């Protein structure tokens, strides 16, 4: 296999047995593809597909005026260029967006002409607000903060059949219901009641009999009965009654008389139940008529009206029950034929017929009025109003839309073959749904499972943005309709008609404050990726936490390969917020698909198909680990498969598909846990969630035991710098990399140089530090896609969230009781878990009523010492070390004139005015913070003079830009002259540049000329002269282009900043805070094994092995058995082997062994023991040495989930590293030097420091703010609150009998207002007595009792 630039430097030993059939897809595709589809940015006007913005415009336009004399049509749209790039937007606190310009056409028709002749056409581009752009990493910058739009998992539109699980009626009878859910519009529900009548609800309002809806659709009673029932035909001749026999219908009935065949042979005796055998005999005998007694008809329902043959009088309406009186009437009138409905109790119930009987309406108008009354109670119905309302409910494309998905699901569910159709409902649709519902009630067909992923679909960013945009457009449409009537008379242009505000507001509201637009979790690269791949069932149009039951939250068989069964939050959102599985993607309808390999007749091919949950149900799917031979045939007699959402076994020839990878079941975070297969699911859940909270450490350290997914996460997260084009590194320093692009990758007209500016010490959303470090050195060759610089938490292009620690599982003096962690001081000394946090502090100078606030170093009543870190503009220097309470930005605010005392007047008179009319409102460092100022940004509004500091910052930024552009020009120029040199070398000159005619050009000749002189050469060949001219032109153009670029940037920097109204100046100060690990910080492994650091011990006190190597961390062995996360033990053993091998390589390097010996040993490490084979033969000796140098600290291993290292392989690795195969060693107590009595498990585990730091939580209060009503101190660190002394604490003091302590707790220390003020005064005076009064909360209690109407008073003596 080919290794990339970074992979070559450090190869991970891979234990996987299964071949990679398919690479893990790009992890952010779900976000980027969806938004690309929405914008269709690159498409030309004719090639717009009917999705996204284009579809939204087309669904609202054309807008036609009320009179019909003017229309506004949509032609197309184009997106402008963003005003600022992403970094500038973050700095300035603005939205990264592009202007949207829409071309519309106003058509005015001639009123006079009869056939609507066109009188006038005006076309114009209209500005429709800004559309936020997605950054290349799948985020949006909204008001300067990075946000992510989380995808939503909602119920797919379509029709669903369900029952109430017997909960509605006390008898436990199942009541079936059908619900038609459109993409937008009214919901339509059909439901049975306990008496088996069918009712309809629209938008969950009051229910009406379902027949009312059918009548409103124009069906008569007879048509309804014809649609839903078959009929039995009876012939009457005199006193005799005969039935046209359909033998199947008799099944299960009891014979009322003997049934004979034509020969008179009895087939069924009277009183016997008719069985399938009897029916067969009847069919054989060919009995067509059956004589039945007259009472056989009684109780049956007529299917058609019975009409008097002579007079035409209607004897009985259809749907009437046959009674004795009616029979006599019918016989009298000599009616020869009656039809009754065929119903029975088994599979053909009389539900619709019963419903028609309770229906009070008799014609279409009455039904429409009834529906109108239900929808608009209290309004007087008119015929027109009722018709309009009903038609708008389900049959108008403006109000109702099933969408393509909904139509596809609808048609499939009611058994139609075509999947396309209209977005509105038709009569037939509604009748088909009712038919299907009745069939299900009759026992034919089954109800749907709403948690099946075939019935839930994913709405991504693009779709949600489109819906929001459409909402805005519909608001615009109303306004435009009003104005269009004026346009005819007043000759308005399209621009005057369209007000873009509603659209812009709708878009802004969605991106800024929708529940699904979330502040990006930027703790580390993994948390970013996971956040973008999250799928939430909450949000608008989704579920709510309170209403979601257990079924929705549960793992469903269809989650396999689509949604991760492990990664979900603990707490109220469990199961509602999920993560996409590693290989999952959405199809065009928004259903999640998973990839499978095709299997034919037991032979596995490499063809891959993506299937949705519905499509995969009929397939027989083998696991990725199914045993195969070299010819890719399945060799087991029975293969473990999934079929019809069940796990079972089948023969190899029945298998149709096979998983592509064992890790396709889990999400990215879960696939980063080695030995996941040995962990209990609950702990694995905690493990995958806690990796997202790991804080990037000062020096990233790759995990010794990984899973091989680390590289994918680091590459796709966008925190690393990836080469856009291949080439040679021209220059590199800490903050930028310049690449001279290889010739074959340079398109014509492009510059042959790429400049990558690295992100240095920038604040992330979680206040952690984003910093990139170059990995390449000058002269290195890189390919497209190679990683050139590491970001936070990445090490040589691999994700590195924590540190490899030498750990021992042993109890140690109770310091690791209850999951506590005991650390060695060495961990702190080596800065293993030191993290850098960056805080942004903002100072805003506003224009107040009394005058402008001023940022200045001249602050009243502040000593020199406090100002020594400020410059003359009153802003702190970069690099200053500041502590709590230090001034960062000096600011004074004018204060109102107060009445002056005579003394003050005297002072005023002596010292002038300034001294006292301003107050100090400087920005100070908050309590408990100590750090270094690393950056200062100054923003000044237009028209306000910029201070010296702002100008200095601007000059520095311009120098940076100029340096970049000069560098680019230097390389472009260099490359051009190189190309010219190779073209001119050996050619003959025709004169010019001081050279004689006929001179042959050599390198020396060219070196003797200045570059400017080269263009004066006249060559003998015309082609060369042309090339020289072209080169000269190219260089001039390039210079001009770069100068324009510089001017553009300069203009942007020098224009005033767009600040909020009333704000004159904003100063942002960035503080870098270094946090070492300390007791109280939370740490965790990757297996859900979390704990709090309890003590940091000196190195000499830690347990050590026979060689004297101390351990770094001591963990409690009791944390393992009950939690069943054995993966951590296996990781510890394999980590020990990895480290041991590294030390062995280190010894070989120290002894300066030959490269050949190293090659042999490395081959043994990589290829002898299980797993993937690495081809080291293609490495040069230098590359082998470089590789060995990077392996000194440990050979990194990959043990992919469900396909990882086996126990015997771990033992073999330990043996190869000359370590005990048990993974246990004898340890000695560091304090006494005595041996511990049992060998202890020692090894290397990857530990993370989580973003729950004691510094952020530690808090103490002296006096502070109080709650308004109860007068008790507030709670929480943010409010500078106190500690709650709750009821259990009160009991504790009561149990001790500490009466006075209890009294002061409940009074002067809490809410006795007078007592606490007095106490404060007393303490100041040195008098420590207290006089407790009445606690305020007691007064509140009295008031509350009074509010119940009980007069309560305290009797005070």
Swiss-Prot record:
Keywords: DNA-directed RNA polymerase, Nucleotidyltransferase, Transcription, Transferase. GO terms for molecular function: DNA binding; DNA-directed RNA polymerase activity; ribonucleoside binding. It is an enzyme of class 2 (transferase). Its EC number is 2.7.7.6. GO terms for biological process: DNA-templated transcription. The keyword ATP-binding does not apply. GO terms for cellular component: DNA-directed RNA polymerase complex. It catalyses: RNA(n) + a ribonucleoside 5'-triphosphate = RNA(n+1) + diphosphate. DNA-dependent RNA polymerase catalyzes the transcription of DNA into RNA using the four ribonucleoside triphosphates as substrates. PANTHER family: DNA-DIRECTED RNA POLYMERASE I SUBUNIT 2. Belongs to the RNA polymerase beta chain family. The RNAP catalytic core consists of 2 alpha, 1 beta, 1 beta' and 1 omega subunit. When a sigma factor is associated with the core the holoenzyme is formed, which can initiate transcription. NCBIfam families: PRK00405.1, rpoB. This is DNA-directed RNA polymerase subunit beta. It comes from Pseudomonas putida (strain ATCC 47054 / DSM 6125 / CFBP 8728 / NCIMB 11950 / KT2440). The lineage of its organism: Bacteria, Pseudomonadati, Pseudomonadota, Gammaproteobacteria, Pseudomonadales.
């Amino acid at each position: 296999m080919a290794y990339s630039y970074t992979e070559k430097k450090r190869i991970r030993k891979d234990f996987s047995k299964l071949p990679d059939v398919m690479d893990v897809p790009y992890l952010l595709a779900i976000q980027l593809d969806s938004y690309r589809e929405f914008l269709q940015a690159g498409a030309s006007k004719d090639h717009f597909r009917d999705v996204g913005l284009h579809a939204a415009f087309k669904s609202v336009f054309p807008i036609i005026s009320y009179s019909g004399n003017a229309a506004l049509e949509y032609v197309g749209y184009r997106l402008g260029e963003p005003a600022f790039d992403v970094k500038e937007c973050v700095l300035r606190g603005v939205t990264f967006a592009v202007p949207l310009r829409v071309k519309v056409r106003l058509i005015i028709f001639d009123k006079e002409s009869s056939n609507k002749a066109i009188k006038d056409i005006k076309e114009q581009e209209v500005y429709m607000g800004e559309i936020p752009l997605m950054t290349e990493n799948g985020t949006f910058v909204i008001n300067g903060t990075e946000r992510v739009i989380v995808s939503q998992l909602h119920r797919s539109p379509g029709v669903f059949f369900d029952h109430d699980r017997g909960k509605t009626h006390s008898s436990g009878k199942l009541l079936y219901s059908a619900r038609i859910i459109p993409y937008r519009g009214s919901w339509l529900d059909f439901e049975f009641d306990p008496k088996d009548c069918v009712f309809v609800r629209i938008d969950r309002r009051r229910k009406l009999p379902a027949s009312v809806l059918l009548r409103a659709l124009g069906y008569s009673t007879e048509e309804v009965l014809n649609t839903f029932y078959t009929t039995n035909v009876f012939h009457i001749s005199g006193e005799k009654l005969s039935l046209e026999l359909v033998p199947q219908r008799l099944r299960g009935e009891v014979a009322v008389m003997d049934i004979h065949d034509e020969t008179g042979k009895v087939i069924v005796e009277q009183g016997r139940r008719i069985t399938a055998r009897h029916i067969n005999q009847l069919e054989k005998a060919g009995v067509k008529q059956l004589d039945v007694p007259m009472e056989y008809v009684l109780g049956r329902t007529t299917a058609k009206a019975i009409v008097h043959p002579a007079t035409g009088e209607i004897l009985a309406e259809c749907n009437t029950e046959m009674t004795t009186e009616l029979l006599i009437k019918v016989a009298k009138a000599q009616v020869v034929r009656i039809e009754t409905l065929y119903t029975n109790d088994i599979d053909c119930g009389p539900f619709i017929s019963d419903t028609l009987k309770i229906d009070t309406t008799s014609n279409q108008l009455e039904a429409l009025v009834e529906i109108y009354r239900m929808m608009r109670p209290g309004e007087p119905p008119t015929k027109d109003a009722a018709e309009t309302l009903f038609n708008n409910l389900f049959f108008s494309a403006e109000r109702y839309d099933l969408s393509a998905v909904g139509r596809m699901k609808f048609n499939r569910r009611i058994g139609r073959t075509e999947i396309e159709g209209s977005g509105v409902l038709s009569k037939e649709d509604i009748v088909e749904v009712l038919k299907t519902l009745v069939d299900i009630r009759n026992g034919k067909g089954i109800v749907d499972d709403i948690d099946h992923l075939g019935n839930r679909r994913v709405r991504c960013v693009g779709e949600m943005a489109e819906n929001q945009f459409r909402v805005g457009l519909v608001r615009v449409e109303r306004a435009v309709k009003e104005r269009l009537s004026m346009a005819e008379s007043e000759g308005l242009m399209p621009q005057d008609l369209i007000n873009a505000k509603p659209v812009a507001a709708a878009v802004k509201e969605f991106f800024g404050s929708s529940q699904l637009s979330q502040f990006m979790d930027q703790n580390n690269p993994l948390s970013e990726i996971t956040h973008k791949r999250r799928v939430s069932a909450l949000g608008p149009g989704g579920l709510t936490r309170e209403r979601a039951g257990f079924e929705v939250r549960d793992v469903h068989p269809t989650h396999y390969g689509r949604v991760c069964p492990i990664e979900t939050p603990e707490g109220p959102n469990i199961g509602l917020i999920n993560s996409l599985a590693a290989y999952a993607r959405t199809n065009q309808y928004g259903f999640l698909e998973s990839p499978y390999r095709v299997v034919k007749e037991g032979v596995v091919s490499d063809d891959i198909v993506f299937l949705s949950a519905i499509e995969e149900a009929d397939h027989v799917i083998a696991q990725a680990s199914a045993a195969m031979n070299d010819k890719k045939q399945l060799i087991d007699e029975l293969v473990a498969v999934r079929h019809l959402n069940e796990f079972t076994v089948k023969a190899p020839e029945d298998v149709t598909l096979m998983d592509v990878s064992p890790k396709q079941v889990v999400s990215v975070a879960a696939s980063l846990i080695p030995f996941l297969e040995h962990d209990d699911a609950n702990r694995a859940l905690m493990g995958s969630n806690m990796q997202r909270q790991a804080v990037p450490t000062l020096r990233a350290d790759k995990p010794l035991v990984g899973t091989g997914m680390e590289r994918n996460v680091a590459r796709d997260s966008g925190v690393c710098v990836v080469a856009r084009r291949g080439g040679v590194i021209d220059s590199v320093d800490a903050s930028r990399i310049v690449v001279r692009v290889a010739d074959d990758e340079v398109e014509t007209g492009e510059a042959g140089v790429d400049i990558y500016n690295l992100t240095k010490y920038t604040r992330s959303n979680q206040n952690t530090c984003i910093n990139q470090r170059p990995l390449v050195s000058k002269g290195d060759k890189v390919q497209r896609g190679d990683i050139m610089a590491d970001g936070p938490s990445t090490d040589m292009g691999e994700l590195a969230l924590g540190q490899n620690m030498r750990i021992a599982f042993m109890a140690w003096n109770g310091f690791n009781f209850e999951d506590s962690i005991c650390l060695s001081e060495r961990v702190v000394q080596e800065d293993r878990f030191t993290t850098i946090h960056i805080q942004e502090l903002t100072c805003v100078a506003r224009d107040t009523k009394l005058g402008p606030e001023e940022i200045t170093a001249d602050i009243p009543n502040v000593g020199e010492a406090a100002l020594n870190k400020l410059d003359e503009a009153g802003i702190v220097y970069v690099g200053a070390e500041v502590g709590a309470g230090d001034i960062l930005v000096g600011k004074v605010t004018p204060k109102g004139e107060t009445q002056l005392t005579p003394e003050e007047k005297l002072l005023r008179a002596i010292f002038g005015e300034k001294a006292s009319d301003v107050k100090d409102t400087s920005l100070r460092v908050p309590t408990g913070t100590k750090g270094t100022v690393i950056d200062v940004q100054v923003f000044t509004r237009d028209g306000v003079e910029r201070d010296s500091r702002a100008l200095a910052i601007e000059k520095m930024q311009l120098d940076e830009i100029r340096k970049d552009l000069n560098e680019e020009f230097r390389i472009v120029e260099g490359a051009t002259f190189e190309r010219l040199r190779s073209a001119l070398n050996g050619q003959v000159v025709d004169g010019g540049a001081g050279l004689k005619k006929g001179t042959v050009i050599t390198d020396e000749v060219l070196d003797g000329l200045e570059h400017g002189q080269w263009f004066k050469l006249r060559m003998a060949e015309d082609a060369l002269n042309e090339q020289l001219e072209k080169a000269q032109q190219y260089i001039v153009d390039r210079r001009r282009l770069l100068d324009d670029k510089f001017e553009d940037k300069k203009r942007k920097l020098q224009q005033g900043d767009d600040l909020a109204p009333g704000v004159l100046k904003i100063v942002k100060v960035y503080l870098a805070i270094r946090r070492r690990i300390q007791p109280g910080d939370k740490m965790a492994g990757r297996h859900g094994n979390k704990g709090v650091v309890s003590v940091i011990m000196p190195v000499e006190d830690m347990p050590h092995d026979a060689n004297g190597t101390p351990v770094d961390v001591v963990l409690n062995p009791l944390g393992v058995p009950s939690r069943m996360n054995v993966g951590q033990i296996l990781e510890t053993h394999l980590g020990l082997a990895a480290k041991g091998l590294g030390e062995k390589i280190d010894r070989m390097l120290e002894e300066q062994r030959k490269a050949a010996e190293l090659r042999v040993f490395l081959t043994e490490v990589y290829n002898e023991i299980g797993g993937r084979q690495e081809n080291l033969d293609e490495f040069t000796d230098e590359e082998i040495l470089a590789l060995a140098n990077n392996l000194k600290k440990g050979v990194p291993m990959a043990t992919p989930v469900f396909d990882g290292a086996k126990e015997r392989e771990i033992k073999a690795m330990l043996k190869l590293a000359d370590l005990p195969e048990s993974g246990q060693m004898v340890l000695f107590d560091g304090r006494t030097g005595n041996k511990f009595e049992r060998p202890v498990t020692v090894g290397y585990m990857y530990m993370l420091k989580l973003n729950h730091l004691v510094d952020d939580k530690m808090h103490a209060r002296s006096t502070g703010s109080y709650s308004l009503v109860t007068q008790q101190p507030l709670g929480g660190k943010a409010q500078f609150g106190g500690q709650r002394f709750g009821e259990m604490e009160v009991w504790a003091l009561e149990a001790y009998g500490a009466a006075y302590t209890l009294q002061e707790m409940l009074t002067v220390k809490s809410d006795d207002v007078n007592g606490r003020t007095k106490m404060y005064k007393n303490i100041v005076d040195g008098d420590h007595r207290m006089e407790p009064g009445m606690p305020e909360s007691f007064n509140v209690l009295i008031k509350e009792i009074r509010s119940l109407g009980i007069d309560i008073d305290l009797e005070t003596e």
